[in-house]
Amino acid sequence: MGRAPCCEKMGLKRGPWTAEEDRILVAHIERHGHSNWRALPRQAGLLRCGKSCRLRWINYLRPDIKRGNFTREEEDAIIHLHDLLGNRWSAIAARLPGRTDNEIKNVWHTHLKKRLEPKPSSGREAAAPKRKATKKAAAVAVAIDVPTTVPVSPEQSLSTTTTSAATTEEYSYSMASSADHNTTDSFTSEEEFQIDDSFWSETLAMTVDSTDSGMEMSGGDPLGAGGASPSSSNDDDMDDFWLKLFIQAGGMQNLPQI
């Protein structure tokens, strides 16, 4: 939707109004009213647009327009209405008889708005505690995020690594020495208490020799010197021999390990 052509394109006048134009506009509005601002310039015979005629009438040519400065009551009313209506200047002007929306807007931006704004000093004082609180919160956050580990210098790290390596090497050497000692002891015990076949062969040979010598000493007498049976004496000797042998073998096994 295109914008409607304005004053210069339609051959209408722009700029300040003359006294003759003001008189024609006032006479037409007093006679016919201003129900249609778009058709009013053509009906009144003015080379102006409808918007220019409306603003000239409302802001300058109305009979009830107040001239001069705003009173204290009017300023308070503008502040209150601005809180309720915002920047709706026409609605505010409708509740202030004799004042135009253009005048109200100008006095608001020139005087009233600056009066309501806080002073720079108070603003800085209010912002200072907020900045302090923000700094404290940032400090607490940094303290929480900092890791508890303490940084170690390269020299300390190298010494720690060397010490741990030496400790590990000593422990490995002690374990190996203990294992070798246990193995040597077990081998020594087995070698000391191992009874091979040669031991029993020598023992049996000694038994046979002692038996033969006993029989020779008896002189072939079946009953011996005391009238006892040779077989019974030999049996007793054999029993005593085997008993001593087993006792000696048991004692050797009960010897403490070196």
UniProtKB/Swiss-Prot annotation:
Residues 211-234 are annotated as: Disordered. The keyword Transcription applies. Disruption phenotype: No visible phenotype under normal growth conditions, but mutant plants exhibit increased tolerance to cold stress. Transmembrane segments: none annotated. InterPro entries: Homeodomain-like_sf, Myb_dom, Myb_TF_plants, SANT/Myb. One of its GO terms (molecular function) is DNA binding. Residues 37-61, 89-112 bind DNA. Its main location: nucleus. Signal peptide: none annotated. Keywords: DNA-binding, Nucleus, Repeat, Stress response, Transcription, Transcription regulation. Pfam families: Myb_DNA-binding. Induction: Induced by cold stress and flooding. GO terms for cellular component: nucleus. It is found in: Nucleus. It comes from the Eukaryota. Residues 9-61, 62-116 form the HTH myb-type domain. Interacts with TIFY11A/JAZ9. Acts as a negative regulator of cold tolerance. Negatively regulates beta-amylase genes at the transcriptional level in response to cold stress. Suppresses beta-amylase gene expression by interacting with TIFY11A/JAZ9. Maltose produced by beta-amylases has a role in protecting cell membranes under cold stress conditions in rice and may contribute to the cold tolerance as a compatible solute. This is Transcription factor MYB30.
